[in-house]
Amino acid sequence: MDKKLSMALVLLVFFSMLNITADFALATDSVTIRAPAVSKTSSGYIGAVLYITVSAVPGDGHIYVDTWPLTELDTQASARLAVEVAGRMTGKDVTKYDFYYVVRSESPVIGGPSAGGVMTVATIAALEGWKINNDVMMTGMINPDGTIGPVGGIIEKLDASAKLGIKKFLVPWGQTVITTQETIREENRGIIQIITKPKKVNVVDYAKKNYGIEVIELEDVNDALFYFTGKKFSEKEIKGEIQVNTDFLSEEANKSLQKNIEYHDSIEKELKSAKMGIYEKKYMERYLDTAQDFIDKAKEDMKTGEYYTSLSELFNAEIYIGVVDEYLNADDLDKRLKDLEEKINSVDSELKEKREEIKGIVSLEFLSAAEKRLKDAYDYLDQARNYVNNYDSLNAVYAIAYADKRCDTVKLWLNLSLKYSQGEKISIDDLKEDAWKRIEEAKLVYVYVSSMVGESSVSDAARSLNDALSEYEAGRYTSALFYAIESNIESSITIELSMSGDDPGVIGEKIQRARDDAKIAIQLSREEGYEPMLAECYYEYGENFEEKEDAANAFRMYKYAKEVALAYKHISNPETMPTVVTETPSVSTPLPSTPSSQGTTTSKEGSKFILILGSGLVGLFMGILIGSTFRGK
């Protein structure tokens, strides 16, 4: 009986392990794709080819990168960003997969993110089980928003790719005409000179003439997917003209306008009668003049219904008036700081108390705005203390004025949050989880971009990321989420604008795309049944900056509008999956063997290998187990 029981247990273990092994094998998808690179030799730079195998298996969100010859850290950063973008595009939860990237090359290549786009394509193909068309190769880094960023060494990469018999070569948008360095040998009166001169090259003509290859510009990963797989994700189109309306702020804007006019007149009279030096008085008058300019701008913007922009301008006006007010009346700065701290703490307590009453997405967005402004008020209070301790009275009164007026705006957004509180209550656990995911994403993008442009260029992103972490620790999860969004945006615009150079055409196209993306995000929110009021505020502000030809801030505000509109989308509709459109079949040529890639397999071969290996291990285990069972008897 004992032998029969033991044998039954052995068989149960055997079939269970075999089933697990088979399930794992069937769930394994691997894709091998080729990416052009640049290698440095004694005679200069030449093209090289990377063979990248990507596997996606059920797991816990780990990402493993195996490279040979060794490459730089940006390859790891590119892999992580590829997973992030792939998850967003496919709608799959990438934390439920482990990803393996095996990168091989016949020669050492120069570090760089130019394979990021290819890695993203391969990652999506692995997740979806799609085949790759090997008649196509591509160069281009991956941006956090899924667009393809510019790279160098395009001619060298094209030369290397041509040797593989490809038919199409994909390049980032705006890089079909590039500047290369041409080395010229000149002789003048017996003296030979080697001169390097810049030379413009039309990549389309060069590829057609020398190799018969078609060069195609890409805007984003979705475009690349079409050429590599014959499939792409359906993209939302703007349905008619998207109307942005901030009328819900009209009452607050009118109140603020009247308040600022009266405040300005009052402090102006007080300044005129104040006893101080002529230069000191003129210096204060300039603050009031600047405030008046903001008031005048706000009046004009209110005429066209731009109420959020008007409120922003009136906030600035009130700060400048407040500086003069504090300068004239704050005789005891230490006491003023104590009073201001009590005011901010009181508003903080009210916010904590009212937070429990918040219901619905719109109310939650306004709560985010209130919490973020509260953090701002505390930060400027700390700055004011430092200035007072260092006897810097002028900067101290500016920081005091800012913290005081910012505290007032916390009340404004909190009241709006309560006014529009309706619907279901949002789970704190969901908010906490969402905030942490956003922070992790912001960390990833920051590391990626800083590896490209240096940490000093993304200091604003680092500051916002630190703010996100501190707000998360304080339990203000909506504020933490928005600071994480801010960090992500700051990193993204840094890399995108820095790679655009001074080309107004490229920058204009990026702003247009950002504007359209924001419109689509607003449209999606409306289709899901709620009005993304805060996103509309940022969109309006972006239009205002665009009218002023402030490209960087317009770009920034449109990106804010998009991200804010989608910030809580998964809470209201977590199961939304993208639609796949097949437009043309993908015709694939056989892929040559990968250099030094023994053990790298395709999807089916990998599954068979894992199944055979797993079965063998199970058999070995069974033999030991059976033997020990009967020897024990």
Question: Which residues does each predicted region cover?
Answer:
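Long, charged/polar, soluble alpha-helical segments
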Residues: Y211, L218, N222-G632
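Peripheral, non-AAA+ core regions of ATP-driven protein-machinery
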Residues: A25-K299, L311, L328, R336, ...
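Short, basic-rich loop-to-helix N-cap that marks the start of a DNA-contacting helix
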Residues: K3, A22, S607-F609
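Extended interaction regions within the primary functional domain
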Residues: V13, L26-L70, A561, L566-S597, ...
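C-terminal segment of classical bacterial N-terminal signal peptides
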Residues: S16-F24
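Sec-dependent N-terminal signal peptides
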Residues: K4-F15, I612-G616
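Positively charged n-region of N-terminal signal peptides that target proteins for export
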Residues: M1-L5, R631-K633
